[in-house]
Amino acid sequence: MKRIGILTSGGDAPGMNAAIRAVVRKSIFDGIEVYGINYGFAGLVAGDIRRLDVADVGDKIQRGGTFLYSARYPEFATEEGQLKGIEQLKKFGIEGLVVIGGDGSYHGAMALTKRGFPAVGIPGTIDNDIPGTDFTIGFDTAINTVLESIDRIRDTATSHVRTFVIEVMGRNAGDIALWSGVAGGADEIIIPEHDFDMKNVAKRIQEGRDRGKKHCLIILAEGVMGGNEFADKLSEYGDFHTRVSILGHVVRGGSPSARDRVLASKFGSYAVELLKEGKGGLCIGMLDNQVVAADIIDTLENNKHKPDLSLYELNHEISF
């Protein structure tokens, strides 16, 4: 394989630049040319493609976001969009593609695979909701960003003896809420993957107040409901001096953590190895601290991401 293309798609995640850097440098080290595709699959179809050199990825490993930019492009789900994309890849002489992104990006890579074009998926999303890997690029940075906010909010919550509902991103997955909640000593963690009873939540808050507790922190995954809606429902069971903090897109930004930089570097290098060996139609992951590759079609069609619910039970046992 003489030429590899790379794109980032969907929501950005800290560490994407580190992955791009690894792909570019590993490729050049192995004598392979790399072409960067701007704006994801939209840029692919439009032919917004340029050659990348070592200098292009210098001073990038510490930066959040993606310097190749990203975009959502639902048209790539159509036959016309896919064929146009393959036409552009062939026009530039690109023989294999690295796709960094989340679930939608993986489906784009899978579509190319089904049409006979070798593509390798790298999991890059703060949501940590991709099957076939324990952790995705950007997740560690995201939970540390949330954790910093939890620590700050606790200060003001204690000063005013308040309950705070902290809404965090994650789409339909509760991993960000779960991990940051345990690390931040949350009183309650509300996630889509586990039922909850508002009456019991209110009961636990009141029990804490009765023991003299000066704050209550509830970490709410956005996939359950909005923070303001949750606070309104909670108020039906008592006045807990509740305030709502919606962290939103701030969780996506910032310099990637050491863990995300290392993870991204490992994934990027391995993606090049796979394509160099002529292997496409795969997605890369980290399972039991080992970098692995699995069939992307099988992974998407027959697997479903599951959070570590033992953390939910742990928090319930130690959060009173």
UniProtKB/Swiss-Prot annotation:
Location(s), subcellular: Cytoplasm
Regulation affecting activity: Allosterically activated by ADP and other diphosphonucleosides, and allosterically inhibited by phosphoenolpyruvate.
Chain sites annotated for binding ATP: G11, R72, Y73, G102, D103, G104, S105
UniProt KW keywords: Allosteric enzyme, ATP-binding, Cytoplasm, Glycolysis, Kinase, Magnesium, Metal-binding, Nucleotide-binding, Transferase
Main localisation: cytoplasm
Keyword 4Fe-4S belongs to the record: no
Uppermost EC category: transferase
Quaternary structure, from the entry: Homotetramer.
Protein name, entry field: ATP-dependent 6-phosphofructokinase
